[in-house]
From Swiss-Prot:
Expressed by the salivary gland. This peptide is considered as a venom peptide. Keywords: Acetylcholine receptor inhibiting toxin, Disulfide bond, Neurotoxin, Postsynaptic neurotoxin, Secreted, Toxin. It comes from the Eukaryota. GO terms for cellular component: extracellular region; host cell postsynaptic membrane. Transmembrane segments: none annotated. This is Venom peptide Tv1. The cysteine framework is III (CC-C-C-CC). This peptide has a cysteine scaffold similar to the M superfamily of conotoxins, but it displays a disulfide pattern previously unknown in native cone snail peptides. It is found in: Secreted. Disulfide bonds join 4-20, 5-21, 7-16. GO terms for molecular function: acetylcholine receptor inhibitor activity; toxin activity. Injections of 20 uM of this synthetic peptide (Ile) causes partial paralysis to polychaete worms (Nereis virens), the natural prey of terebrid snails. This paralysis may be due to an inhibition of nicotinic receptors at the neuromuscular junction.
Amino acid sequence: TRICCGCYWNGSKDVCSQSCC
């Protein structure tokens, strides 16, 4: 699952992205 907008857990850390909002 790829989530490209917002904050989510990628398995080892929180990732925050605004790359395709």
